[in-house]
């Protein structure tokens, strides 16, 4: 069978496809975003720490230009002076270097996240084939990268050139100033120029981030056949099947709990079961079950019912029969019509009592539940 072309891959990648690509180290990256953040951090460090940096660099420059006649006869003094100058330069530039390195390590995480994959480091002999390399040279991706580089270089060059032309007199005055003052003013000029460059490239960086995400998703597009194959593969995975069933049960239980406030009555076996019933004589031919559960779920049904003032009736045989023989969203069995009718009659009496007051209606007893629908062992357990 011939391989599918890119034209056939019109579907967005599935979460499984994205996760698999991530495990293989295929995530969107924007070098422009990293460059922008590095430049921005450098500008901030120079802007806020420029005075201290200027003093240290000026002191280092002054010490470097100072000539000690003893160095002529003692080469060790020259070596010691060089080491001192290197240490001074490192201490002066340490905040700038540390900030830039830290941002260079962290910035890729902002777009694609932190991931370590050894697969991208494995040798691929297919890369030795020159034909795919030549094809990549003339691809749309390469053309877009070239256009982006030309635009960025042009923009940075124009901003820098305009800035130098506008501040040329100030730069010329630096030669007449003391070393410390000149160094501080020079750093201010450099910082302002870098800030203007940052502001100029922000729109381009935003476009690059969007372009990288779009290209990444386009590269991972799938055909309809790919999606069907992935689904079949996932369906055969017991872990995935179990996860799907678990999610389906959780969703069904969540929907069921949302329907409890709509119930007219909750029939309970206090130690085991709860069944919520609803009946609308204008829309339903028979009462239906909107929620049911055992154990903790039964307790939660009763709690939600109490929060919404849904009447609760303790009727263990009826609760057991409804739990065993009625399904959620379905009408109750015909054999239980008589018992449920007595329960609903009590509910209507209870509603009238709440509105008009008077004597509270007694709960129905000895409801007619067929023995075939009850379970004698549970009946004995309840006492």
UniProtKB/Swiss-Prot annotation:
Topological type in the membrane: Multi-pass membrane protein
CC annotations in GO: plasma membrane
Location in or out of the cell: Cell inner membrane
Pfam families the record matches: Bac_export_2 (PF01312)
Topological domains annotated Periplasmic: 1-32, 167-190
Family (UniProt): Belongs to the type III secretion exporter family.
Protein name stated in the entry: Flagellar biosynthetic protein FlhB
Protein species of origin: Salmonella typhimurium (strain LT2 / SGSC1412 / ATCC 700720)
